[in-house]
From Swiss-Prot:
One of the GO BP terms on file: regulation of DNA-templated transcription
Ranges annotated as spanning the membrane: none
One Pfam family linked to the record: PRMT_C
Classification via InterPro entries: Arg_MeTrfase, Methyltransf_25, PRMT_dom, SAM-dependent_MTases_sf, SH3-like_dom_sf, SH3_domain
Predominant subcellular localization, coarse grouping: cytoplasm
Subcellular location: Cytoplasm; Nucleus
Official protein name in the record: Protein arginine N-methyltransferase 2
Active-site residues annotated for this sequence: 213, 222
Family named by the database record: Belongs to the class I-like SAM-binding methyltransferase superfamily. Protein arginine N-methyltransferase family.
Catalytic activity line of the entry: L-arginyl-[protein] + 2 S-adenosyl-L-methionine = N(omega),N(omega)-dimethyl-L-arginyl-[protein] + 2 S-adenosyl-L-homocysteine + 2 H(+)
Known partners and oligomeric status: Interacts with ctnnb1.
SUPFAM superfamilies assigned to the protein according to its UniProt record, in alphabetical order: S-adenosyl-L-methionine-dependent methyltransferases, SH3-domain
EC top class named in words: transferase
Amino acid sequence: MESSSECSSISDFQDSTEGDDANTLPENLCMREYVVICDYVATDNTQLSLCSGDKVLLLNAVSQDWWWVNHNGTCGYVPASHLHDALNEQEDTEVNDPWQDEEYYGSYKTLKLHLEMLSDVPRTMTYQNVILKNSSSLCGKHILDLGCGTGIISFFCAKFAQPEAVYAVEASKIAEQTCRLVEQNGISSLVHVIRQQAEELDLPTKVDVLVSEWMGTCLLFEFMLESVLQARDRWLKEDGVMWPSTACIHLVPCSAYKEYSNKVLFWDNPYQLDFSLLKPPATKEFFAKPQPDYILQPEDCLSEPCTLFHLNLKTLQVAELERMNCDFTFLVHTNGLLHGFTAWFSVQFENLEEQGHLELNTGPFSPLTHWKHTLFMLDEPLQVQKRDKISGSVVFERNSVWRRHMSVTLSWVISRELKMQKVGCKVFPIWR
Ligand SMILES: N=C(N)NC/C=C/[C@H]1O[C@@H](n2cnc3c(N)ncnc32)[C@H](O)[C@@H]1O
């Protein structure tokens, strides 16, 4: 596991931060007992292998990511994410639930997020168009609307098509409101609201269509996709339809001068004072994680975007989500500053009644959606010019402990006329 600062690896990070107070956590965290919440297998002789439930004594929190502990007389490094403060035991539901379901479903029980999603016209109208354009194919069919929220997709099915039944499955408390909406609109003989986690679902029959709006930041965050794939394997007929049918993640190198100026250059001379020593901590504080609500302007793209991953949701396996990596090469088409990379996703819906497919694209060349764009800022901007090449790789790695979270590792090489100019690498947690 690497730290979140650029070009560092754990061994460099350990050497450079040994006894470095700037990186140790407050003393009050040390000399306390911690419980291991997830097995860990050491990857070198400075680390300890531990099992879930082991108790350790924290000796030195050398960084946010790695802690030096004593376990039954043996000392070594373990990932801090695998430890929980045994003396300050939170509710079991919080600590022992790597899916954080109580917090997760709690966030969907109020109207805030549902209002945001329903207010997203490109998102919601895409689903309406999919139902509209396939209405005759849906006649007499069984449909599963997974994570239905307020039931909007199920309402579209009842309003624009004549399916046999729609199973509107929703685990959060909002399902109580969804029930009332379905009754009030007189469609309860067609739309069956089931307040249940999809994983525990019991339906009277397999379904012809599994439709869901499961996409999170960078497509995968929340990993609701795992629930969708499990429901596919359990409830979708062999020749059934997945909507969305495919999903893509796109990336482009970009300038983000205003972001960099507002968050870092600001410290050069606020009110004509030199606060520039705050620029490094500002960079770490504001750019260690991606900005999930960034709006990339098309003119800030430094090259054509590329498609990193193209997922087929009829065949994708949950295990493939653990780690996905892809190489990329961008040909810079504009002189400028490379401040970072921006990512977004698109999803495609197979059309059952004519050639082609419908698409919801959340990128900078399509109508803005509530997902906006995800900006990965480098620690330092890099000068690039037309015809430079930015090649490298990206790794999406699912968090082995917190199962709704992931990290994105970006590695890049900037070359000019075949001569290597700049090399870099940075790990971005989303969000743990
Ligand atoms: N599109 C975004 N960002 N969020 C996805 C939308 C999430 C909605 O789906 C529900 N949901 C998520 N996972 C499950 C599950 N396994 N079983 C039943 N309901 C579920 C949540 O409570 C939200 O209402």
